[in-house]
């Protein structure tokens, strides 16, 4: 099989022997794939940066049997601000785990990759509340996956009178269920945080850059 040129971002990096790495990469056309980066741990390796967690770049791959191998990489964005901030790194790692669960191999992941990159950009380059960013990410991802969050009733019990929005569960809750959720915000009008989360999650231009 010939070489494949694709953009991608590293979701997971694992050491393999003394000098190599096994990576999980999200690409727009191939979906989530596993690929080996030979010699990536060597100090002078051309793959040293391109094989790191959250590196987004232009990759040249080739496939042997069932495994992809990285020939070369041209890094585009490494999200440096996330790497140096523990809080930002925690949230970026959390959304990465969600992306891992939501994607598969051999499926078009263009829109999910776009959402993931835009969310990482928001975490890295802005001072927006990280819980807000996470909640909007979850709402937008659910929409991409074909799941519409409940709006008119409580996520937990189905009560119609909902007064709180859960940042943790990305949906509305009644006053009783909200007592068990520290991330629930009282809704008092369209301009409050909870409604901003919902409207941002529904807006196609949210996180666009």
Task: Please describe what each predicted stretch is.
Residues 1-209:
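Non-catalytic alpha-helical scaffolds and adjoining flexible linkers that form interface surfaces
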């Amino acid at each position: 099989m010939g070489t494949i040129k694709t953009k991608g971002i590293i979701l997971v990096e694992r050491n393999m022997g003394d000098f190599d790495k096994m990576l999980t990469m999200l690409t727009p056309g191939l979906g989530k794939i596993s690929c080996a980066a030979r010699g990536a741990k060597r100090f002078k390796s051309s793959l040293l940066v391109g094989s790191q967690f959250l590196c987004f770049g232009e990759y040249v791959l080739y496939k042997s049997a069932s495994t992809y191998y990285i020939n070369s990489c041209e890094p585009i964005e490494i999200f440096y601000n996330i790497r140096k901030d523990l809080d930002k790194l925690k949230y970026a790692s959390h959304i990465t785990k969600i992306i891992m669960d939501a994607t598969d191999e051999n499926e078009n992941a263009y829109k999910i990759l776009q959402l993931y990159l835009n969310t990482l950009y928001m975490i890295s380059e802005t001072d927006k509340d990280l819980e807000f960013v996470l909640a909007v990410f979850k709402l937008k991802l659910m929409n991409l996956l074909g799941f519409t969050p409940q709006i008119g009733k409580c996520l937990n019990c189905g009560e119609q009178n909902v007064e709180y929005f859960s940042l943790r569960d990305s949906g509305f809750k009644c006053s009783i269920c909200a007592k068990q959720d520290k991330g629930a915000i009282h809704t008092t009008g369209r301009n409050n945080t909870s409604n901003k989360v919902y409207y941002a999650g529904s807006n196609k231009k949210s996180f666009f850059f």
